[in-house]
């Protein structure tokens, strides 16, 4: 298996790593798990830690010269490496800890391929993938292109703190905006799986406050996926995401993005 990982392209490595993490997440679901306090009300479970170890095993075997930034383990791997993988082994830990299956496993090569695994999507989970140019959902060996659409009218809004954009922007205020109520229906899943759903046409958009999220272990895979699928991706200020970025607005199409920005800017 290790030799076969080394022969994969970057998208294949991302898929293999995300699936390895998703396997652990499924296996440990519903068990009593120890919690590791991270401060500020945040915590990791033994599932987070075990899933990250499984992901790192794949990445180290397949790309030993690359560096890794993990949500739980921090920076690891080759010092001075030009390539860096961003890993969030269990996005939605709070959901998972109380028995909710709304979680994702995120693996992204910074500026390249990425995979977002839904451990509980379908019989054996599904993986949303990009090679940096194309985007598809993979079930087993079957692939289906991702086609975003704003037709659902469903918009995921992240209401988890912190809220650095306040008081200028408050996500909760968007939900009460009369134009939002007339055009969209809010959803709050508290996991970046929602980004994959925008790329797949299951959501019209995703909105979150924040700073520069382009290099975040939580968001990098979903952002890469949405860009490759043809979504419109900006900060909450309408500007490109990056070092000076503010939060994230990902919309299935330009018109959905325009409508949301008109409400956010008011």
Task: Label the model's feature ranges.
Residues 1-90:
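N-terminal subdomain of lithium-sensitive/metallo-dependent phosphomonoesterases centered on the IMPase/IPPase/PAP
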Residues 25, 48, 59, 93, ...:
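Residue-level signal for inorganic ion chemistry
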Residues 64, 81-82, 112, 152, ...:
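Short coil/turn connectors at secondary-structure junctions
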Residues 71, 117, 209:
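Conserved residues at the C-terminal ends of beta-strands
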Residues 79-136:
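DPxDG-like acidic metal-binding loop motif
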Residues 128-131, 141-152:
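Short amphipathic beta-strand/extended segments with alternating polar/hydrophobic composition
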């Amino acid at each position: 298996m290790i030799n076969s990982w080394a022969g994969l392209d970057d998208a294949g490595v991302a898929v293999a790593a995300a699936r390895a993490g998703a396997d652990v997440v499924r296996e440990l679901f519903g068990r009593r798990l120890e919690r590791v306090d991270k401060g500020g009300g945040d915590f990791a479970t033994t599932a987070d830690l075990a899933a990250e170890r499984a992901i790192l095993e794949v990445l180290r075997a397949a790309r030993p010269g690359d560096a890794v930034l993990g949500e739980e383990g921090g920076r690891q791997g080759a010092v001075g490496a030009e390539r860096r993988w961003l890993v969030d082994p269990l996005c939605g830990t709070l959901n998972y800890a109380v028995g909710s299956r709304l979680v994702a496993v995120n693996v992204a090569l910074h500026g390249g391929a990425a995979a977002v695994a839904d451990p509980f999507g379908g019989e054996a989970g599904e993986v949303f993938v990009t090679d940096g140019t194309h985007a598809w959902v993979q079930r087993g060996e079957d692939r289906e292109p991702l086609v975003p659409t704003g037709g659902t009218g469903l918009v995921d809004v992240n209401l988890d703190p912190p809220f650095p954009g306040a008081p200028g922007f408050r996500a909760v205020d968007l939900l009460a905006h009369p134009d939002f109520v007339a055009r969209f229906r809010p959803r709050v899943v508290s996991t970046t799986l929602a980004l994959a759903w925008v790329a797949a046409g299951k959501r019209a958009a995703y909105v979150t406050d924040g700073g520069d999220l382009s290099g975040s272990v939580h968001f990098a895979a979903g952002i890469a996926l949405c860009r490759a699928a043809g979504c419109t991706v900006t900060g909450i200020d309408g500007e490109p995401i990056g070092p000076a970025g503010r939060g994230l607005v990902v919309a299935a199409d330009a018109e959905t993005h325009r409508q949301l920005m008109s409400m956010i800017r008011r």
